[in-house]
Amino acid sequence: MSRIELHNCDCLPFMKQCSDKQFDLAIVDPPYGIGKDKKFIKKCMTKQKNGKRLFTKCNNFSIKEWDEIPSQEYFTELFRISKNQIIWGGNYFVEHLKNSSCWIVWDKCNVGTMQSDCELAWTSFKTAVRKYEFMWSGMCQGSESNGKIMEGNKKLNEKRIHPTQKPVALYKWLLHNYAKEGDKIIDTHLGSGSIALACEEYGFDLTACEIDKEYFEAASKRLSDYRVQM
């Protein structure tokens, strides 16, 4: 049975209390100032097969004071306490990262929309670049059986509770491909808590920090609700 520890705290002081290489794998999604110079788009546009454009409502999220790129000290501590790392948005932090042969490309299958086609993750692994396909555009989300195909039953869609929320299926894929049985995982920016659900289902121990009380409580509730459904 997995052990999930969620902490409502600033991750930097927390990491300073951790031992060297205490965690086998860090899977993190640090902020990179997405709301600093622009407002979040209120509607998501998806191009349909017939060529028409479909506008779907997206959740609106307030800009938070903590939404800033982490310092060098953050990355120094992250590398100290973990043996391997997967860092989402690594393309925004290149000045803090070494060259890597193994980037992860998440194809969100939303070509023709106003959103980014892909998101990138830097990794410390010595393998080739890998791509994962899972639709993620407003109300258009991939199905559990085939991430490239839109889920027909909208009741099965994940509720958006965070502006940079990523699907649980993506974290399951990461754990399946990059974590080993018995690995201890750390996430410094829990956000929506998707990683907690994936670790719970796959049996990985997780330690996670979330500085924002609103998101921490929402992610904690999401995990509790998920456990009831399992």
Please state what every model-predicted region is.
Residues N8-P13:
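Conserved SAM/SAH-binding loop
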Residues Q17-V28, Y32-K64, F79-M230:
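Class I S-adenosyl-L-methionine
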Residues W66-L78:
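Active-site donor-binding segments of glycosyltransferases and PAPS-dependent sulfotransferases
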Residues S2-L6:
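Extreme N-terminal starter segment of soluble prokaryotic enzymes
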